């Protein structure tokens, strides 16, 4: 049908593409993309909308190049610039997938691979619709986790605010009282509390620098393959958070793999893309092992089972998919099942986090109160003892 027309079929003749080529040469070959300065980039949410609209326009019979120009006119900023450049590449004879591949910051590997498969199979419209659906589900999953984490995050921020106020304002007041009353031996907990309070009040820059240093160290560690593997392994085993992280990764793996296979992307290339986008080095290593073994002719489910990185339900369902020739459908079912499990895991996580955070706040505040009032109780007891002795002496 019309939707199956490839970009090369819609590309103008060489005569019409020459001015565009000259214009490109005149503008210079350097393309600086600085997203933080508002550079040319399409955000994920906007890309989903553009993909859905592009599928609709192509499905309505509009040629690809014209559809891109229609979308370009509807957009502003970085998205309009990228769409304009993609259209320009197609005008010069490039395939749609080739044009997209030149803008990796806007179009991820999975996007380019699926478009390429759609071009080869003459089903660009259906592939774009599938891509849009995939991105919508991915965004929905991320949104659920973010919204679930919003309340605990607010509670943590409030806790930090309360504790900072106590340490910076309340503790120094008590410290002055102790000094004015010339309290001698303070309990060890009180001394520790006063030292922390002075550090926060007088050398707050050291605390900020320490936190900043930890963030940088974490960023650097995630760039090194070995340390990233260790960090990702710890993430999967984290108390409360671990189940949510592992289920989210399995859901992403299954959904991405299913979408790629359904779109006609070759199995080895699909595994490569899934490995690069899964977001966890432990699972990525397992997928890499699967890819290497599949290249040698082995079945996927057997290798998955041997890696130990995937739950038995996943490997069994994929085994059934291999036997029946419907692995894409089975992967979709795995993704649906695990996305539902993510919802349950997130609900369990938030219900557990709330009381834990309250208990933690109570313990810290309790420690502060006891540390501050122990010297006062000691002073009160010594004063009452002194008053009693004085009263006894007066009676004699």
Please place each PLM-identified region on the residue numbering.
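Core nucleotide-handling region used for phosphoryl-transfer chemistry
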Residues: 61, 93, 264
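Low-polarity contexts
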Residues: 18-48, 53, 79, 123-316, ...
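Short, non-transmembrane cytosolic segments of multipass membrane proteins
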Residues: 7, 12-17, 85-121, 290-324
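N-terminal anchoring/assembly modules that precede and organize ATP-driven motor systems
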Residues: 1-88
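Helix-turn-helix DNA-binding elements, focusing on the entry/boundary residues of the two helices
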Residues: 64, 96, 267
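Short polybasic/polar patches that bind polyanions
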Residues: 58, 90, 101, 119, ...
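Alpha-helical solenoid scaffolds that mediate protein-protein interactions
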Residues: 71-74, 103, 277
